[in-house]
């Protein structure tokens, strides 16, 4: 466990799950932001693996060992046993390593890293990497012969694991697949699965605040991909909007959806809105033909380029706008808060309090209680 001031501690648990007072094991070899410890007992030693140096370019893996669980721990003379020392290499920010031994007796280090594109941006956030561990004559583990992370490596001689493809979701089940995430817990009635649709309740708060809820996201896993969703034509009051979002956090995101204009008789517009720190950029929109039952929203991604298109039949797509450099969706995009999760993409609905403040020419009031209905979401790399 990482203590309050970056001090690695181990909590000793009794069988009745009562926690004793913490005991300091080791301050870390680098003495800066030691975290994520893993203990391994091997050949009479307790090996303490740590991530150190923070989540930026100085991220690294170190190891120390002791004959006794509570120390004293001796730092490895080869530390850091994993770090990227070349800023020009594609794989950076290596840390949080865990040693594993295969059934064949081979040792590997599973660790986190970031792959950069463009001018050093890692839009996929922290990814999982694998490199071999070898043990020195004096009993120390070193990773990839201390050469740093490998961009190309021989995979372990193990049975292949076939994972179920959940790239497309027609929302036919009574539950969401594990691909879907919420940045914050939605309202109790915020997400509903009914009649092969996912219904997202319009949030009172917009995406630019941590109070925003009912945002349904999945991780961006590829540098190049296309995402399409089928949205039932919404009935919106002025100021309300719903659709797709390319989302990092409340500071940086893109909205691509149907917006109701702030008019007594609102028009529906298809808009692309960028949020970059304190700046909001609204691009020229397209009038929506709401005589259609559905509208298809499509986002094509090529590294840091995004192209936004729409269709009424899922065949003939019309481009709304292309953005050439969405750097702000990357971990390094802006300096505001902790950023290491990578970009996400998904769906949202925003109600605000526009509906309840709206009155038409006949004195009828609007409502903030609406749901955006999505028939499917498809992700293809």
Name every feature range the model reports, one short phrase each:
Residues 1-381:
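Carbohydrate-active catalytic/glycan-binding domains of CAZyme proteins
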């Amino acid at each position: 466990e990482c203590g309050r001031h970056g001090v690695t501690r181990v909590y000793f648990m009794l069988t009745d799950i009562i926690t004793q007072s913490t005991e300091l094991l080791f301050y870390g070899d680098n003495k800066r932001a030691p975290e994520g410890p893993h203990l391994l007992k091997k050949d009479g030693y307790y090996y303490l693996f740590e991530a150190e140096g923070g989540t930026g370019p100085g991220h690294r893996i170190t190891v120390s060992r002791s004959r006794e669980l509570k120390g004293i721990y001796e730092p490895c003379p080869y530390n850091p046993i994993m770090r990227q020392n070349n800023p020009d290499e594609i794989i950076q920010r290596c840390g949080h390593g865990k040693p594993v031994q295969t059934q064949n007796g081979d040792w590997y280090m599973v660790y986190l890293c970031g792959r950069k594109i463009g001018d050093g941006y890692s839009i996929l956030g922290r990814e999982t990497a694998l490199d071999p561990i070898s043990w020195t004559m004096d009993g120390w583990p070193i990773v990839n012969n201390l050469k740093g992370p490998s961009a190309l490596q021989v995979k372990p001689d193990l049975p292949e694991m076939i994972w179920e493809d959940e790239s497309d979701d027609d929302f036919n089940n009574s539950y969401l697949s594990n691909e879907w995430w919420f940045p914050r817990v939605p309202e109790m009635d915020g997400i509903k699965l009914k009649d092969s649709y996912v219904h997202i309740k319009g949030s009172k708060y917009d995406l630019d605040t941590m109070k925003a809820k009912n945002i349904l996201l999945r991780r961006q896993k590829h540098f190049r991909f296309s995402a399409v969703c089928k949205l039932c034509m919404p009935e919106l009051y002025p100021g309300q909007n719903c659709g797709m979002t390319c989302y990092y956090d409340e500071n940086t995101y893109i909205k691509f959806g149907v917006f109701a204009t702030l008019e007594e008789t609102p028009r529906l517009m298809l808009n692309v809105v960028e949020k970059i720190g304190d700046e909001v950029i609204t691009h020229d929109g397209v009038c929506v033909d709401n005589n259609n039952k559905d509208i298809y929203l499509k986002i094509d991604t090529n590294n840091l380029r995004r192209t936004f298109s729409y269709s009424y039949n899922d065949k003939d797509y019309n481009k709304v706008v292309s953005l050439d450099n969405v750097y702000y969706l990357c971990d390094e995009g802006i300096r505001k808060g902790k950023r290491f999760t990578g970009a996400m993409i998904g769906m949202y609905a925003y109600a605000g309090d526009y509906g309840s403040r709206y009155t038409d020419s006949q004195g009828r009031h609007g409502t903030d209680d609406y749901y955006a209905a999505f028939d499917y979401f498809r992700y293809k790399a």
